[in-house]
Amino acid sequence: MGKIKVESCEIEGLKVITPTVFGDERGYFMETYNYNDFKEAGIDVQFIQDNQSASKKGVLRGLHFQINYPQDKLVRVVNGEVFDVAVDLREGSKTYGKWFGVLLSAENKKQFFIPKNFAHGFIVLSDYAEFAYKCTDFYHPNDEGGLYFDDPEIGVEWPMPEGMTKEDLIISEKDHKWGGIKDLKK
């Protein structure tokens, strides 16, 4: 039906996708995923799991990845606003350890395609956010890996939600315990 606009990012493989939105006095309609359109844009993957999470302002989730069952992901915000981040973990990549971030919101309707072998995370900037993501492999809880969100070797520049500092962020105990990128080599 509608075509998509695909923007390449500074890190090869990452893509910011803007769908065509059809709107009138009733509201709007958009295709969030069309295999043929994505394939034509160079994103030829088959998604097999669809997830959605809800979080309040100041929640930071990540940085997560799967070790033996890596996933391509297509992420978007259904309600609210987040700053979404991907970190390149591809062995031999010239951008290994580099990060890229993009503002995703219900208003801008942008989506972020993250290939396999990237760590992924986001911080909620609005009062509330619903986050949806498609994956090319199932979630394997015993295969999960992660990086500490504030690893100085990576240097993600997380924007802080209005009225909050880093100390106010809501981060799971597990996400606080992840090591840095140097620990992945061990």
Regions picked out by a protein language model, each given a short descriptive name:
Residues 112, 120-125, 133:
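Short beta-strand His + acidic residue motifs that chelate non-heme Fe in jelly-roll/DSBH
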Residues 1-107, 126-128, 135-186:
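Non-catalytic, conserved peripheral segments adjacent to functional cores
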